[in-house]
Amino acid sequence: MKRQTQHPSDGVAEPLRSATRTSSPHLCPEISLRLAPAGLSLDAFRLAHPDICGAAPPYWAVAWPGGQGAARYVLDHAALVAGRRVVDFGAGSGLLAIAAAMAGAAHVRALDRDPVATAVCALNARMNAVFIEAETVNITTTETADADIVLAGDLWYERMDARQATRLLRSLAGSGIAVLIGDVGRSELPRSGIDWLASYRLPADEGLERSAVVETRVGWLAP
């Protein structure tokens, strides 16, 4: 499997800084991220910055609610990750990876299939004064056997990707790796086999959600 580790100096850092704005997720005010300007849809952001995004949806440009909830839970329950090897699966902006690093994880990897996302992860990690390894991989086939805990937020938007992610995450859980997920209850989220731990309400981006306020839940995924 080909892996590419990204660093914030990999040529896209300056364009990313110009295109994005620094903001803090509602549930994680202690974390700063480079995100799309408020009120700008993903499509509008992609069309405005084709040199950065290409044809891929810039999922990394939003602090999605499931990731916010899971990151908040990790920050409030640091013992879950302290001293452990953590993987942020489908990392996007790197919010979960950064939360794990801030909570004392021994080693953190942020995995995403979009090379721009992994560059963003590295940029955001540097901005928050934490170290993570950001890698571009095929997240539906990648191996995470060197992890103690896998974090995953908002992977259940699109049917094919959601089903592949669920199969892989359940397989990881079956191998003894703890899998913590966060989601707002989208249609492709498994309806069983999740031990819910907490829920959070937060303002939603009305361009991305169907209501002004959403409830996101965090839980352990069973095999």
Annotate each predicted stretch with a short phrase.
Residues 1-223:
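S-adenosylmethionine-dependent methyltransferases
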